[in-house]
Regions:
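Active-site-adjacent mobile loop/cap segments within catalytic or ligand-binding domains
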Residues: 1-54
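Short, glycine/serine-rich, charged loops/turns that create anion-binding
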Residues: 19, 86, 166-169
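Pro/Thr/Ser/Gly-rich low-complexity, intrinsically disordered linker/stalk tracts
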Residues: 52-92, 142-157
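Recognizes extended acidic, P/S/T-rich segments that occur
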Residues: 93-127
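Beta-strand-rich modules
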Residues: 124-140
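Low-complexity, Pro/Ser/Thr- and charge-rich linker/hinge segments at domain boundaries
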Residues: 151-171
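Conserved small/polar residues in nucleotide/adenosyl-binding loops
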Residues: 181-187
Length: 188
C-alpha cells in the first residue's frame, strides 16, 4: 500500500490531520491561525527533506513582522517601525533584513526598499496619503506582508489624529458550546 510513499525517488507525504467526525478538529480546520501553522510545518518538512536529499543546508523563510506603526517625525518625515517575530522552533528563520513597501494615495505599492533595521525614516509630501507594509527577508525568502498602516500630513493641519488598530483577532467563526438542558420547563 502507498507505493508512492515507500519509493525514495519520489518525495511524498501522507498527511492525516483532522477528522471530519470530530467537532473539535473541525473548529481547528476553520481557524486561519491553525491553517498557517500546519502549512508552515508542511513547508518546513519538505524543505528539510529536499535539503537532506542533496546534502545542502537550508534556511527557513522568516515569519511576518508585528507591531507595525507609523508616526510623524521632525522635518516633515514619518517614522515607520515594527518588531521582528522569531520562530522559536527554527533558528534559521531569523530575518536578516526587511522590505518596506510604500503606496502614495490610491496608487499601487512600489517594489519596496530594503532596510537592515526594524525602522525607516521617510519624507512625506503634505496632503498625500502614504501607506506602508513590511516583509521580513533572509536567505530562505520573504515573509508574508504585515498589515498596512497609513499617514497623511495636511498642509493646514490644526492638530494630529492618532488611529489605533486594536483589532488583531483572526479566527474561525464563533462556535458556541451549550449545556444540555433536561428541564421540563418547556412542557409547562
Amino acid at each position: 500500500a502507498y507505493y508512492e510513499a515507500r519509493v525514495p525517488g519520489v518525495p511524498t507525504m501522507l498527511l492525516e490531520l483532522l477528522s471530519h467526525q470530530n467537532f473539535a478538529d473541525m473548529r481547528y480546520g476553520s481557524d486561519p491561525r491553525f491553517k498557517f501553522l500546519v502549512s508552515r510545518a508542511v513547508y518546513k518538512g519538505i524543505l528539510r527533506y529536499i535539503s537532506s536529499q542533496y546534502g545542502l543546508p537550508y534556511v527557513v523563510q522568516p515569519l511576518p513582522v508585528e507591531s507595525l506603526a507609523v508616526q510623524f517625525a521632525e522635518g516633515g518625515k514619518a517614522a515607520v517601525t515594527w518588531s521582528p517575530v522569531m520562530d522559536s522552533l527554527e533558528t534559521t528563520a531569523a530575518p536578516t533584513g526587511y522590505v518596506v513597501y510604500t503606496r502614495i494615495d490610491d496608487g499601487g505599492f512600489d517594489n519596496g526598499r530594503y532596510v537592515d533595521n526594524p525602522c525607516l525614516l521617510t519624507a512625506q509630501e503634505p496632503g498625500r496619503i502614504y501607506s506602508y507594509k513590511v516583509t521580513a527577508v533572509n536567505e530562505g525568502g520573504e515573509s508574508f506582508p504585515s498589515e498596512t498602516v497609513a499617514a497623511c500630513r495636511m498642509p493646514d493641519e490644526k492638530g494630529t489624529v492618532l488611529i489605533v488598530n486594536g483589532f488583531d483577532r483572526v479566527s474561525a467563526p464563533l462556535s458556541v458550546r451549550c449545556l444540555l438542558y433536561t428541564s421540563d420547563a418547556a412542557d409547562e
